Design a protein with these regions (language model features):
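Conserved alpha/beta-hydrolase
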Residues: 118-137
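Short beta-strand/loop motif that positions the catalytic acidic residue
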Residues: 249-251, 256-258, 262
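Catalytic histidine-centered segment of alpha/beta-hydrolase-like enzymes
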Residues: 289-303
């Protein structure tokens, strides 16, 4: 019987090792601890050397956004989390952009500059803290698997509050771009007229594998534990965070914008999404722009792309309403 006990001990040990490794991977990749509260004169910019040249701009945008008249809004997610957003209005009745930030970011830090962009082209802005980020509740980042439902909930909130004539544009950067891309294939209110996906990834699995590879770690060894950690400890499947699958059923016009010098999320991922999308679409590459920096790198081209595509989706909307 000794061999049986040894065998069972080995099996139990392997299972325990797998669970511990998966738990470690879960905490590294998906877990978001309690966020610190910034003081009235404290501001942050995203980590990384590529953002240092834009530090003054980003802090200026955040300071300006904090001082603007605004309304703090909360909604409840489908699984009971309180989600936070900040609404800033320049022109009553103007289109509202609902903006979603990226991985481990939060609205004020990552999206304050988008307020000026929105105002410059006649739009109001609702800046959202995604689940497990900023002032929103939750501790698990799901790479869009659950965030896509939050996006739909925000769109429904705006539609119900502002009425059937209120135009809504879904906008996201990085993971936020992936989130709005996935939401664009779901049941959205008729108010949603367009989606802007800035530097999205095509699949959560793909971008996680890419990062593991960039760290010179064995993808074949670590990724299964990342995937298992998401399932066991995060309560979601990575396969449910696939913009590439979702975009095949995209129901609204969508514009993809990506910096061609993005070394975090390759711009080819936007190409994949563009090719798979059946709806009215446009793709724009910003030369020399790093990750999430397409707008500050070339504002003129960014504005031009948005305004050109607005003409297209308005014509599409008129044609659709006429039929």
């Amino acid at each position: 019987m000794t061999w049986l006990y040894v065998t069972l001990g080995v099996i139990f040990g392997l299972i325990l090792l797998c669970l511990i490794t998966s738990l470690v991977c879960f905490f590294i990749v998906f877990y978001s601890p309690k966020r610190k509260t910034l003081g009235p004169d404290e501001y942050e910019i995203p980590p990384g050397k590529i953002y240092e040249p834009y530090r003054d701009y980003m802090i200026s945008w955040a300071r300006k956004a904090r001082a603007m008249p605004h309304e703090d809004i909360t909604i409840t997610s489908y699984d009971g989390l309180t989600l936070f957003g900040r609404y800033v209005e320049q022109t009553k009745g103007a289109p509202i952009e609902i903006l979603f930030h990226g991985y481990r970011g939060y609205g004020e830090r990552d999206l304050s500059g988008a307020i000026d962009r929105c105002f410059s082209i006649g739009r109001n802005a609702l800046i959202v803290d995604q689940r497990a980020s900023g002032k929103s509740e939750g501790n698990v980042i799901t790479f869009g698997a659950k965030e896509k439902y939050d996006c739909v909930a925000w769109a429904n909130y705006v539609a119900q509050r502002f009425g059937p004539e209120q135009e809504i544009i879904l906008c996201g950067v990085s993971m936020g771009g992936a989130t709005v891309t996935m939401a664009s294939s779901m049941e959205l209110p008729e108010n949603v007229v367009c989606t802007l996906a800035d530097c999205p990834y095509s699949t959560a699995s793909g971008i996680i594998k890419k990062i593991i590879k960039d760290l010179k770690l064995p993808v074949w060894l670590l990724f299964p534990f990342v995937k298992l950690g998401a399932r066991i400890f995060g309560g979601f499947k990575l396969e449910d965070a696939s913009p590439l699958e979702a975009v095949k059923n995209c129901k609204v016009p969508i514009i993809f914008i990506h910096g061609d010098s993005d070394d975090f999320i390759p711009h080819q991922m936007s190409d994949e999404l563009y090719e798979a999308c059946p709806s009215l679409k446009k793709i724009v590459k910003i030369e020399g722009a790093g990750h999430g920096l397409a707008f500050p790198t070339n504002k003129e081209k960014y504005y031009g792309a948005l305004l050109d595509f607005e003409k297209q989706w308005r014509a599409y909307k008129e044609q659709k309403n006429a039929t």
